[in-house]
Regions:
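Sec-dependent N-terminal signal peptides of Gram-positive bacterial secreted proteins and lipoproteins
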Residues: 2-23
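Bacterial lipoprotein signal-peptidase II cleavage site
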Residues: 18-39
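N-terminal secretory/targeting leader peptides
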Residues: 21-28, 44-140, 150, 158-356
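Conserved glycine-rich "GG(E/T)P / GGGxP" loop and the immediately following alpha-helix
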Residues: 155
Length: 356
């Protein structure tokens, strides 16, 4: 824990984005107690593993699925190791934003990280393939692909950057919700001021669809929707409730246009110094935690849908998704990135072969 002291202090003072979907503590909510851990063993467990404590972090608040996931992961690991492996759980921006905490994990200040996959792409561009629009029709497809050999192929190169890939979790399919008009077809977004994350890939999509994308950090979103700077947002269903960004929302359209992942990774030096038996438990339970995140997103989306409907939001559960795909030109849309350093045609073809 000594190595965390300075980072905890810095994280407590920093104003940063929340994890994996950029969640922040909702109004009226209370911050969960960060720094929780499963009970540590004082003697070797029945499997002969020496007691060990590792730090795990996800920047989101207690309502975010990534934070729920690392809490469950800590439980699973402790149980599978007969109490020998303790994961010291931190969350709620305590150790910084996605970008800050990923860098801290690369440096070894944090042992294990579960953060938005997009946060890794600033230095690991190969993962940008997962930010392509309409790559997956559902979260179920994303799970099958990213937790297969293809997922290992996408993320194996992380070791060159001081990280070891463990599993890929879920943070939801992105949809569109608006303050001023229903959206059923691609034609309905013409000129629409839609807030998107500060990512060129997101900007490209909405510009191609004829909307007016506005790149804003998440903490600016609620105010932007209130004052008209933005008229729409693209987020997973549960994010609107977890982030309290639905007060001005009147319409919600389930277009499933982009999937958001969360990546579980370990500091490479920490990982390489672990007993192989510990590595096996961490890897296997990371896969179980990834599945937990997908299942929990599904449940939280259902709950959030009811909350939004009770607040008067009108849902279009069957929009004309094909009109959006057609407006982008189908899979040919991806060709514009062929000259980008991160573009890998063979990898993209492997993904498409699984989902088309």
């Amino acid at each position: 824990m000594k190595k965390l002291a300075s980072l905890v202090l810095a994280g407590a003072m920093a104003f940063s984005l929340a994890a994996c979907g950029n969640n922040s503590t909702p109004a009226g909510g209370s911050s969960a107690n960060a720094g929780t851990s499963t009970p540590a063993a004082s003697t070797p467990a029945s499997g002969g593993i020496e007691p060990i404590e590792l730090t795990i972090y996800s920047p989101g608040n207690e309502n975010s699925v990534p934070t729920k996931t690392i809490i469950e992961y800590a439980r699973l690991v402790n149980e599978a190791s007969d109490g020998a492996i303790t994961l010291d759980v931190h969350h709620s921006n305590e150790l910084g934003s996605d970008a800050e905490s990923i860098e801290s994990t690369r440096m070894g200040t944090i042992d294990l990280i579960f953060a938005g996959t997009s946060g890794f792409t600033s230095f690991y561009e190969k993962a940008k393939v997962l930010d392509l629009p309409f790559l997956f029709d559902s979260a179920e497809q994303a799970y099958e692909v990213t937790n297969s050999e293809i997922g290992e192929q996408i993320f194996s190169g992380l070791e060159e950057f001081g990280l070891v890939f463990l599993s890929e979790g879920d943070n939801g399919m992105r949809h569109i919700s608006t303050t001023n008009r229903p959206v059923h077809t691609a034609a309905d977004v013409q000129g629409l001021k839609i807030r998107v994350p500060e990512s060129q890939l997101y900007l490209d999509v909405w510009q191609a669809l004829g909307a007016t994308p506005v790149a804003l950090a998440l903490p600016e979103l609620a105010l932007a929707l209130s004052n008209g700077t933005a008229e729409a947002q693209d987020n997973a269903t549960y994010h609107l409730v977890a982030n309290a960004t639905y007060d001005d929302i009147k319409y919600f359209s389930n277009i499933n246009y982009m999937w958001m992942g969360c990546t579980m990774a370990a500091n490479a030096n920490t990982w390489n110094g672990l007993d192989p038996a510990v590595q096996e438990i961490l890897k296997e339970q990371a896969k179980a935690a990834a599945k937990y995140s997908f299942d929990t997103i599904a449940t939280d989306n259902e709950t959030a849908t009811k909350t939004l409907q009770d607040a008067g939001v009108e849902f279009d559960f069957e929009p004309d998704v094909q009109s959006f795909k057609d407006a982008l030109g189908g899979d040919a849309y991806y060709d514009q990135y062929k000259d980008e350093s991160w573009y890998d045609q063979e990898l993209l073809d492997a993904i498409l072969a699984e989902v088309r």
